[in-house]
Amino acid sequence: MQRIRCLLALFALEATGFAGPASAVAQNPADDWRPRTLPLYGVSYSPEVGLLLGAGLVHTRYAFRALPPSTRLTAAAAYATGARTYRITLAGEFRRPLAPATVAVDLYASGLEIVRYYGLGNATVASGPDSVYQVRQTQFAIAPTLSVPLAARLRLAAGVMVKHARTHADSGTLLFAAGPAYGSGFGAAGVRTLLELDTRDHPTAATSGLHLVIAAQWYPALWDAVRPFGSLSAEAATYASTGDPPRATLALRAGLAGVSGTVPFHELVYIGGGTTVRGYPEQRFAGRSGAYANAELRLRVGWLSVGDVGVLGLADAGRVWGEDDASRRWHAAGGGGLWFALRHRRASTVSVTWARGTEHPALYVRVGFMF
């Protein structure tokens, strides 16, 4: 669950997403349909990752006076000062005029997917120094996908995933002592599918709507996978607000996931950190299945000339299940924070949150909200 999301979000200067030309057609109708290239930039912070700085470019091209765009190309790179590693992503989306399907190709090289390993189970301890639990792993992946709309705001996507992970054998770490059966490198190729319903009014700072994602992956016994393995996950988030523009927003989210087969350690279900249960280290708990829930109450308390100012309260909980795991404990955390929307634009929202679990408090800074 944690691996499919990144704390770093990227802004496009003067535009976010597929920038449509409708607002300026009357002034410059010819210019609005020309190809455009915009810079991207982003920043976030979490304890184990550190300061994550990112930049990139997004190029958008339209067919003859047709929306949505026919081509969108994105290139981005980020570096984490705490984890001392990087993530590079290349993505392309391609559409033919009047055709409903979208072809996407995603490539990435990343050392940020897995940064900690505390062992398998819901009751693992973290009494040693932090260096014992650190993981240095670089993942390389390519994933072509075909996406088809089933209804308004509902899409089905399917494709293949080719992935290789290289793990450094750092002596003195818990992972080195456990000794992954496959050694330092693991390659696999499989298929994946995703069903997504998205009625949110904004992707990173929603105030209304529903977001539901159900995803599955399966890898046959090919390459370094001696036996088949797979995963299934589901996540749902909903939002309710009062006022126009919204003065208060209640955001709720729940998710669960499970794996089967002979799974490499980096494909386990992980709970903890800035994308699942805040107030715990990244990948604090690992298991063959897991669940989490989050709640945030976001209040707008100030309307300044430069933007909106707000506060929020949060509560998170989650757990994993391992083999013969007798623990019944749910790991919970609570906290709060501030948020600011520059120029009253939700696309320019930055949030700063503080959360405390049972081990130590943690500070998070990100573009938008966690969900």
Question: Which role fits each region the language model picked out?
Answer:
Residues R192-L195, G336-F340, R345, H360-F371:
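Outer-membrane beta-barrel "beta-signal"
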